[in-house]
């Protein structure tokens, strides 16, 4: 069977994390009542004029810097002209001729341990279109999304398989999330992925027609779409047929790509400069200031967690899978020096609760202060690790009491006073005289039994190390 070289390019549309839209003051909020967040500018009323959202430009600069791009200091916009119901003006404001970012790169770590640099062609700013909802042979339009700020990030056609495409989008998502450029929720459409896929026989310098797959909304769907489309195109080429230039979509139910439309000729969008937005000169000092305030990226945190805080790579990676968990961890380690204990508790019992309730850590009652208090009390030998089974369910669901108040109310403090422990042992020793006779031959069994009775009598509130020493001493004194 003939082997083919796979050529993949990735385009990502990323909704910017701004309070207002790209060219209007309308509020940006997901899940609101349809058509309640669109003003005269968004709906293209005659006489309305756009104004550039400064915050959106800042976020675009941050993204360009993180992706090692050349940042253009002259900000200009263009009109992309076409008619479609989701585009009220009859054109989209974008950056065709002069994107804010060019010639970037992003390194990904492959599963075989090798690394690959993905070349990025451009990053440009534009506005989103209205959302289309298809139902019962009708199409509804929600203009709440119309005009929301976007950045589009386009790679060069340098990816070669589904693994690379998935790893690239995952890494891009992580960077944009930790930069606070976007919430990158693929299921909500704030990170949308388009793929351009073509095949050619190895050794050929001619590309076959590319097929575009639109609006992939999960990493798993990216993988499935790439694998299906590669096989589909292979079958066509092996029959000596021509792959038609098409736009397709991925269908979850059939696990296949479905034809949306064929592309016989490329569409002429009649691009020209946006006359209502004058060119804006971005001062180099302003760009430098924006970059200097860039949040710490996940890769930087990963190095710090392992090298400075002593976490394992595995624990660091689990913490960093969620921005909410990472922020919680950062706040907690400011209140305690037992960084490993914080990580272990977050990724075990706390994560188990989050998984059970399908929540993020900022959606439950647990506070960094209370988690740090539990760890500090254990480290100071005021409570035992066993007592966390009593305390944690309370502080996970309520923040009305401090941990110290809970410990006091439930009498959970460890008994560490030797005289007090000795007094508690008197009755236990007296009730187990026959057992003590076995001590010379079976010392471990005797100690374990006496310790068990002591723990039962005190509800486990005795320091085990101190108690063990006193138990041995008391037994030997009563032989």
Swiss-Prot record:
The keyword Nucleotide-binding applies. One of its GO terms (molecular function) is asparaginyl-tRNA synthase (glutamine-hydrolyzing) activity. Keywords: ATP-binding, Ligase, Nucleotide-binding, Protein biosynthesis. The gene is gatB. Its EC number is 6.3.5.-. Belongs to the GatB/GatE family. GatB subfamily. InterPro entries: Asn/Gln-tRNA_amidoTrfase_suB/E (IPR017959), Asn/Gln-tRNA_Trfase_suB/E_cat (IPR006075), Asn/Gln_amidotransferase (IPR018027), Asn/Gln_tRNA_amidoTrase-B-like (IPR003789), GatB (IPR004413), GatB_C_1 (IPR042114), GatB_Yqey_C_2 (IPR023168), Gln-tRNA_amidoTrfase_suB_CS (IPR017958). This is Aspartyl/glutamyl-tRNA(Asn/Gln) amidotransferase subunit B. Allows the formation of correctly charged Asn-tRNA(Asn) or Gln-tRNA(Gln) through the transamidation of misacylated Asp-tRNA(Asn) or Glu-tRNA(Gln) in organisms which lack either or both of asparaginyl-tRNA or glutaminyl-tRNA synthetases. The reaction takes place in the presence of glutamine and ATP through an activated phospho-Asp-tRNA(Asn) or phospho-Glu-tRNA(Gln). It holds the Pfam family GatB_Yqey. The keyword Kinase does not apply. Disulfide bonds: none annotated. It comes from Mycoplasma capricolum subsp. capricolum (strain California kid / ATCC 27343 / NCTC 10154). Heterotrimer of A, B and C subunits. It catalyses: L-glutamyl-tRNA(Gln) + L-glutamine + ATP + H2O = L-glutaminyl-tRNA(Gln) + L-glutamate + ADP + phosphate + H(+); L-aspartyl-tRNA(Asn) + L-glutamine + ATP + H2O = L-asparaginyl-tRNA(Asn) + L-glutamate + ADP + phosphate + 2 H(+).
